[in-house]
Each structure stands twice: as C-alpha cells, then as structure tokens.
UniProtKB/Swiss-Prot annotation:
<dbReference type="GO" id="GO:0140662">
    <property type="term" value="F:ATP-dependent protein folding chaperone"/>
</dbReference>
<feature type="region of interest" description="Disordered">
    <location>
        <begin position="608"/>
        <end position="642"/>
    </location>
</feature>
<dbReference type="GO" id="GO:0031072">
    <property type="term" value="F:heat shock protein binding"/>
</dbReference>
<dbReference type="InterPro" id="IPR013126">
    <property type="entry name" value="Hsp_70_fam"/>
</dbReference>
<dbReference type="GO" id="GO:0006457">
    <property type="term" value="P:protein folding"/>
</dbReference>
<dbReference type="InterPro" id="IPR029047">
    <property type="entry name" value="HSP70_peptide-bd_sf"/>
</dbReference>
<feature type="compositionally biased region" description="Gly residues">
    <location>
        <begin position="611"/>
        <end position="628"/>
    </location>
</feature>
<dbReference type="GO" id="GO:0005634">
    <property type="term" value="C:nucleus"/>
</dbReference>
<dbReference type="InterPro" id="IPR029048">
    <property type="entry name" value="HSP70_C_sf"/>
</dbReference>
<keyword id="KW-0067">ATP-binding</keyword>
<dbReference type="GO" id="GO:0006616">
    <property type="term" value="P:SRP-dependent cotranslational protein targeting to membrane, translocation"/>
</dbReference>
<dbReference type="GO" id="GO:0051085">
    <property type="term" value="P:chaperone cofactor-dependent protein refolding"/>
</dbReference>
<dbReference type="InterPro" id="IPR018181">
    <property type="entry name" value="Heat_shock_70_CS"/>
</dbReference>
<dbReference type="GO" id="GO:0016887">
    <property type="term" value="F:ATP hydrolysis activity"/>
</dbReference>
<dbReference type="GO" id="GO:0005829">
    <property type="term" value="C:cytosol"/>
</dbReference>
<dbReference type="GO" id="GO:0044183">
    <property type="term" value="F:protein folding chaperone"/>
</dbReference>
<protein>
    <recommendedName>
        <fullName>Heat shock protein SSA4</fullName>
    </recommendedName>
</protein>
Length: 642
C-alpha cells in the first residue's frame, strides 16, 4: 500500500487525504477537524500551527501569519503583494526583492519567507497523515490554483521540500476536483467540465476539457479576493451595527471584541447553510455587555447578495474565453467550503438552466481527495484504476465509559474509521456490589465531567463477590451510519444489558466538537497531572483495601502475630479514613501516604510471606491498578466501574 498523500494547500484552510484499499480517506488533524487553518503563530515560548495558531490570533495579531499563499512565488513590488500587505496585522518587508514576514519569536525579531511559512503548514499536514497512518510519509501530490505561474508553482514545490516531502507532482486544484469525481473516466468522448471553486479567501472558475484521461485547462477566471471571509465580514459589520444600535457603543475600536464577533459570525454562517435561522450569543463581548441576537438565512443572503451575484461574472468570462455556450458544459463541480451556501448553489444551477452540479464529495475536501487519487496512481497503486471510491467516515471524538474516580476510559479513540467494534473487561469497585452503572461519554478529556454524556444503563444482578472479582465485558460497536451500540455482559452469570445511541440524540455539533477538542489541547497538561493524581489515589486505596483484606485471612495472625496484625489493620484503616476525608489531595500527598503505609506493611508482609514460603515481595497488590493476578502499576488492566 502506498503511503503517498494528497495535500490541498489552501489560502485559509488546508486538507490532507490518503488513498488505500480502493477508497480515499480524508485525514482529520489532532483537533478532529478534517481541514486545518493555514495559520502559523509565533509566541515568546513556541511556534503554533493550524487551529492552535488561529485560536490565538486575536491575542497575538502581529505574530500570527496567514495568507502565505498570496505571497508565495511573487515579487515584493507586485501590486497584489503591496495591496495585500496593507491589510495584514503582521509585517511584510522587502528582502532582496522578495516579500518576507517579520515577527517576534522567543524574544527575537525573525523573518520568514512565504515558502517557509507554507512549509510549516505542509509539515503539519504531513504529521497529521503520519499520526493517522502510523508510518513516515514522504511522497505527496500538492495542489495549486490553475492560474499559478511557474515561479509560484516552483515556490510551492520548494515549500514541500523544506517540509521534508518528496513532491511527486504539483497539480491544478480544478483538475484534482475533477479526478475526485472520476470525471476522467466518465465518457470516452471529449467533455467540458466547469469547476466552480469558492473557498475561504479566493474564488476560481476553471473550464477543463477532458479527453481520454488527459486534462486541458481551457480557461480560468475568478477573484483572488472573494471568499468565505468576505461573507464573514459582511455579517460582522451588520452585527457590529446592531450592537451599536442596541447599546450606543462602538465595539469596532476593540480588536479582541471584533475577533470574537468574527468567530461567532463564521459559525453562524456555517449553521445557516443547513438551518433557516441561528442565534448568536456572546457573553461580555464589549465593556461587559452580553450580545444576544438571531439572524435568518434570508438576511444573510441579502447582506451578501452582490457578492454572491458577482460569482457569475467569472463563469461568463471562462465560457467566452473558451468560446463555449453554457449548454455545452457536460459537468459542473462545486468546490470550496463556501459552495455549501444554498444561495450559491441555486445561482449556479439557475445560470446553467437548472443543471444540477456535482456535490456528493464534501466541497472543502474534494481537491485533497483528487490529489490523493493522483498520488496513488503516481506511486503505482493499481487499484486506483477502480473509480468506485467510497468516502469513509471516522468517529470525530473518542468514546468510552466512566471508571473509578470519574476517569474517562476510552474504548474507541478519536479518528477511528467506522464501522468499528471494541471490547474491554472491567470489574466492580466495592465488595458485594450488586450492579454497575455503565455511563457512555464522548470527548478527549481525562475526567468524564469535562466530556459529553451520551447515555447510561445499569447492569444489575451481579452475584456477591469481593471487589475486582466479577468480570464485566463492555463492548462498543459503531455501524456505518455512526450509530453506537454499547453492551455489557457479566461473564459469570451471562447477565447483559445494552443501549443504542443514535447520532442526533445528545451528540455534539461540529462546532461543539471543534471547541471540545481545542479545549482538550489546551488542558492536556492539566489532564495528565489529574490522571496521575487519580492513579496515585486509586493505587493507595487499592493497596490499603488489599492489606485490610489480608489481615482477615484465616492464618494471617498466626504467621505474623496478633500485635503486627493489629498494627497493619490500624494502618490500613487509617489510610482508608484519610482517603475518604482527602478526595482532593495532591499526587505527592497520595504517594507520601503510600510510602508511609508501605513502611508499616512491608516488614509485616515479608514476615507473612516468609512464613508462607517465598513470595512476590512488596510489589503492587491486585486492585485498582491491576487485574486479578496483580500487574505492574503502569496502568489498569481490569478497571472498576462505580
């Protein structure tokens, strides 16, 4: 199987895909998003790429670089560059006739070429693919707009090289989109395909003629400064005016308020592609004032009406340039996230007298999709001759259950391809526990309280037994439609129960998912500390209970003596009482108590085992940290469900 990938290096967002087993997979990044912002940020301590960079842009505008694609392969005195540079919050300076960005990084002033910035984004896409494929990725097909000239193409290729990629080929974005739809295989005779690509920052229309698998770009047109961000701006201006009308205050003077408003506007715009109305709620947006309002799809369409209409001019231009009538267009392909907007789809369809455009592949993923197919062909993946490609879905967030101490134990990790099935064995937390509550959560955080509860059910009728003895097998099964079945079986009695969770019930929207995963990144360090703390607590608790149980074993007192037995029992009980009273103690405190308890227990237990003849010494004792046989304390094998 080839490890070559296709990368759509976009102005505002980038996307990576891989072709294997007769299908293309769009690879989600570490935030669970299938597209990654083309942003790089520099701070006093680190460099951020993608979502992390875009999320902090409001706080760090001068050192957050975007739109590198508008600068790459151009001269500093290019009017396009001069014009763009005026509007950027970061500095663009002239270095030997080339534009470079100047930022503060780790306390020093540094300059980076557009190639370097693009290479950082490509590196991020490469790592995203490597994390998913579990192996190094070297070969890639990278896409560029059809109007890119030779120096822009070469500079893009250089960016790939800097990122450690072997760029197999630079292909045109419209060509990639046509390949994604298998249009090169659709008919034997020459046919004309119009690609309408409305992205985040740019708008490109291309007319391709495809003849026996050979693509020829007949004409291109477009607007390098029209895209989703312009629609966001219209919405932002409208909302800022409304805020001013309601509160007699102008929030446009505050960069952070504007950035928050823009984020909300982008989210509202996305929602309006599928709903007729959406609400915007921003707490303390400006000078402590909360901003709540709602906006309808009709109002949004009216705000952007002239922009939407202007998309048809380039369509007319490519038809004129290629001397074709609109009736001669065989296929229309919609590409770019902004073509999800219903009004845009309708305008295109109406222009072509009701002809329906191709849009079965996500428009923001179609280019990477086609690039991945091309990469597979170039690396000799024979199966790619079959065009029956499927778009595989993945589980966007990890799924698991709550175990002792409110910990999220993941059964299905994020980005697992669905359908999938996974089972794990758990046990009880208390002696003679009659039942367990299975609570199903989705999310990336260590503690279930920070994740999203999908559903819960009780498995009762467990026969009385000491803690850690009953074996409860929990199975997660997601089908191709994303419907989750969770079942639990007590292996001794065969008692079972299950729950079915469908997509819409209690599941998160894409926005929520993005938010949660972004939070998970931010809190990762805290999460790790918390996990260690709970582990130390569970370990101590388990150790204390096991010691206490040992004392009650029938021959224990004879072997170690009445006094030692009492001493051990008291120490164990003391630790249990302390634990009950100190649920929020630190990792160090738990470890300290564990040491103290071991100090009392080890000599006594050695005496007991010495008398019993040869023993495992004072290794960890079965319980929270171990299976029925006692396992190293590097993590649970049998966990407990409260």
């Amino acid at each position: 199987m080839s490890k070559a990938v296709g990368i759509d290096l976009g102005t505002t967002y980038s996307c990576v895909a891989h072709f294997a087993n007769d299908r293309v997979e769009i690879i989600a990044n570490d935030q669970g998003n299938r597209t990654t912002p083309s942003y790089v940020a520099f701070t006093d301590t680190e460099r951020l790429i993608g979502d992390a960079a875009k999320n902090q842009a409001a706080m760090n505008p001068h050192n957050t670089v975007f739109d590198a694609k508008r600068l790459i392969g151009r001269k500093f005195d290019d009017p396009e560059v001069t014009n763009d540079a005026k509007h950027y919050p970061f500095k663009v300076i002239d270095k030997g006739g080339k534009p470079v960005v100047q930022v503060e990084y780790k306390g020093e002033t540094k300059t980076f070429t557009p190639e370097e910035i693009s290479s950082m984004i490509l590196t991020k896409m490469k790592e995203t693919a490597e994390n998913f494929l579990g192996t190094e990725v070297k070969d890639a097909v990278v896409t560029v707009p059809a109007y890119f000239n030779d120096s822009q193409r070469q500079a893009t290729k250089d960016a790939g090289t800097i990122a450690g990629l072997n760029v197999l080929r630079i292909i045109n974005e419209p060509t990639a989109a046509a390949i994604a739809y298998g249009l090169d295989k659709k008919s034997q005779k020459e046919h004309n395909v119009l690609i309408f690509d409305l992205g985040g920052g740019t708008f490109d229309v291309s007319l391709l003629s495809i003849d026996e698998g050979v693509f020829e770009v007949k004409a291109t047109a477009g607007d390098t400064h029209l895209g989703g961000e312009d629609f966001d701006s219209r919405l932002v201006n409208f909302l800022a005016e409304e805020f001013k009308r309601k509160n007699k205050k102008d929030l446009t003077t505050n960069q952070r308020s504007l950035r928050r408003l823009r984020t909300a506007a982008e989210r509202a715009k996305r929602t309006l592609s599928s709903s007729a109305q959406t609400s915007i709620e921003i707490d303390s947006l400006f000078e402590g004032i909360d901003f709540y309002t709602s906006i309808t799809r009709a109002r949004f369409e009216e705000l952007c009406a002239d922009l939407f209409r202007s998309t048809l001019e380039p369509v007319e231009k490519v038809l004129a340039d290629s001397k074709l009538d609109k009736s001669q267009i065989d296929e229309i392909v919609l590409v770019g996230g902004s073509t999800r907007i219903p009004k845009v789809q309708k305008l295109v369809s109406d222009f072509f007298n009701g002809k329906e455009p191709n849009r079965s592949i996500n428009p923001d993923e179609a280019v990477a999709y086609g690039a991945a197919v091309q990469a597979a062909i170039l690396t000799g993946d024979q199966s790619s001759t079959t065009q029956d490609l499927l778009l595989l879905d993945v589980a966007p967030l990890s799924l698991g259950i709550e175990t002792a101490g409110g910990i999220m134990t993941k059964l299905i990790p994020r980005n697992s391809t669905i359908p999938t099935k996974k089972s794990e064995v758990f046990s009880t937390y208390a002696d003679n526990q009659p039942g367990v509550l299975i609570q199903v959560f989705e999310g990336e955080r260590t503690r279930t309280k920070d994740n999203n509860l999908l559903g819960k059910f009780e498995l009762s009728g467990i026969p009385p037994a000491p803690r850690g003895v009953p074996q409860i097998e929990v199975t997660f099964d997601i089908d191709a439609n994303g419907i989750l079945n969770v079942s639990a079986v007590e292996k001794g009695t065969g008692k079972s129960n299950k729950i079915t969770i469908t997509n819409d019930k209690g599941r998160l929207s894409k926005e929520d998912i993005d938010k949660m995963v972004a939070e998970a990144e931010k809190f990762k360090a805290e999460d790790e500390q918390e996990a260690q703390r709970v582990q130390a607590k569970n370990q101590l608790e388990s150790y204390a209970f096991t010691l206490k149980n040992s004392v009650s074993e029938n021959n224990f007192k004879e072997k170690v003596g009445e006094e030692d037995a009492r001493k051990l029992e008291a120490a164990a009980q003391d630790a249990i009482n302390w634990l009950d009273a100190s649920q929020a103690a630190s990792t160090e405190e738990y470890k300290e108590r564990q040491k103290e308890l071991e100090g009392v227990a080890n000599p006594i237990m050695s005496k007991f085992y010495g008398a019993a003849g040869g023993a495992p010494g004072a290794g960890p004792v079965p319980g929270a940290g171990a299976g029925p046989t006692g396992a190293p304390d590097n993590g649970p094998t049998v966990e407990e469900v409260d």
